[in-house]
A protein has these predicted regions:
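Helix N-cap/coil-helix junction residues
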Residues: 53-54, 221, 382
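Acidic-glycine-rich active-site phosphate/pyrophosphate-binding loop
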Residues: 14, 144, 148, 152, ...
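Glycine-rich cofactor/substrate-binding loops
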Residues: 2-40, 98-102, 284-400
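Short amphipathic alpha-helical segments with heptad-repeat character
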Residues: 125-132, 136, 143, 169, ...
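A helix-coil-helix interface module used to build multimeric assemblies
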Residues: 1-205, 210-216, 276-281, 291-295, ...
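Generic, well-ordered alpha-helical scaffold segments in large soluble proteins
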Residues: 44, 65-72, 94, 98, ...
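Alpha-helical coiled-coil oligomerization motifs
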Residues: 143, 147-150, 187, 191-194, ...
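Acidic, glycine-rich loop-and-beta core segments that form the ion-binding/anion-interacting portion
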Residues: 219-307
């Protein structure tokens, strides 16, 4: 069998430079995604048995071979090679080499278009669910730290200047609430993309009586993505929806990183991490550098590039399939890797956070209480603006 599903003796071999350029790093990416591709292939084969394309014995052989392939993939004994154009090709070649003509039947009623769509859809669902779990872990880390150091007073800041008194609990609690709430955004994204594209084939459906409801149930999707052209139209866009849900997560992670870089500086010295979580200098032996927060801040700043790339590529491709969309795979995978790694590190940093209660107490200086003094005068019947001016004049006089 030819190493490419579309190849024949009449077409000859693809120029190696063109092949390398068009395939790109698909083999590396598909190696990671192969489990989802195998799962969807098994569901498709089961459906083919139901509609009579496969006999019961043929399906059993295919299912056993797919289970064997899945196990080989999980244990690392099956890897994609240069002879595989992509993971879809690798699966069919594996089945054909193992089962002969039976393996050649597995692609009936299916295109690599919907095969790639369902593989990525399963991946995105799983990754969003993993993000939701990480968000809960981060929220719990904040809650745990609030329970131990939350009652400590600290200055609140506006314009990076001391403003009003607050507590560590209120500061950390704001991040707890943020990450807790973002689980709802992730849930909405899952609901939006939880549609089964398998059976749309090349984007126009097929004349076979495919049971798409059956594969929807077997793969755990909420519903069938009915219009086959919409299946193709949503490629890249559903990825965009998912990655956009990660943007606010990275915004809050970046904000916390910025807070920590300020509050751990020697000038503030409010908080610290264990020495095992900081780095040093090759020339200055006294340095304790919070590289982890600098990388987190930079990662958060760069993160919108993922959504910009997905939107640009998806917008530039009209309806129907275009090879441009292949590039959305790596962007999406990298976006999830970045967000999940950030959340994992963030949970660790929060759980290991230590407060310098002595320094925080010293920082609770008189100017933080000016609004409280105004309110005391207001409660005595002084109009607010008059009370404001009295307190301001008194503060300015004392500061000179």
């Amino acid at each position: 069998m030819a190493s490419k599903l579309w190849q024949s003796t009449a077409t000859g071999s693809l120029h190696p430079l063109v092949e390398a350029y068009t395939v790109g790093d698909d083999q590396v990416l598909d190696q990671h995604l192969l489990g989802h591709d195998i799962t969807a292939t098994k569901a498709h084969a089961h459906m083919l048995k139901k509609i009579g394309v496969l006999t019961s014995d043929e399906y059993q052989q295919l299912a056993a071979a797919l289970d064997e392939l899945l196990n080989e993939w999980k244990t690392g004994t099956f890897t994609l090679t240069s002879e595989h154009e992509d993971g879809h090709t690798a699966i069919e070649l594996y089945l054909t080499e193992k089962l002969g003509p039976i393996g050649k039947k597995v692609h009936t009623g299916r295109s690599r278009n919907d095969q790639a769509l369902v593989m990525m859809r399963l991946f995105i669902k799983a990754e969003l669910e993993a993000v939701a779990e990480k968000l809960e872990a981060v929220a719990q880390a904040y809650a745990g730290k609030i329970a131990t150091i939350g009652q400590t007073e600290m200055p609140g800041y506006t314009h990076t200047q001391k403003a009003m008194p607050t507590t560590v609990s209120m500061w950390l609690g704001s991040y707890h609430d943020a990450f807790h709430d973002l689980r709802q955004l992730v849930a909405h994204s899952i609901a939006a993309i939880d549609q089964n594209p398998l059976g749309s084939a090349a984007g126009f459906g097929v004349t076979l009586p495919l049971d798409r409801q059956m594969t929807t149930r077997e793969l755990g999707f909420a519903k069938v993505q009915e219009n086959p052209m919409y299946c193709g139209l949503s490629r890249g866009v559903f990825e965009l929806i998912a990655v956009q849900a990660l943007n606010p997560i990275m915004v809050f992670a970046g904000k916390f990183a910025e807070d920590m870089l300020l509050f751990t500086s020697q000038e503030f010295n409010y908080f610290k991490l264990p020495v095992t979580m900081t780095t040093g200098s090759s020339i200055m032996p006294h340095k304790r550098n919070y590289d982890v927060f600098e990388i987190m801040r930079a990662t958060a700043h760069a993160y919108p590039n993922y959504t910009l790339q997905l939107q640009a590529i998806s917008t530039g491709a009209g309806s129907g399939y275009h090879r441009d969309l292949q590039l959305t795979k790596k962007i999406t995978m990298d976006a999830f890797t970045s967000a999940l790694n950030t959340l994992e590190v963030l949970a660790l940093c929060v759980s290991e956070l230590e407060a310098n209660t002595k320094r925080l107490a010293e920082a609770m200086t008189d100017e933080l209480y000016t609004v409280a003094k105004i309110n005391e005068l207001v409660e005595k019947g002084v109009p607010f603006r008059d009370a404001y001016q009295q307190v301001k004049q008194s503060f300015l006089a004392d500061s000179h």
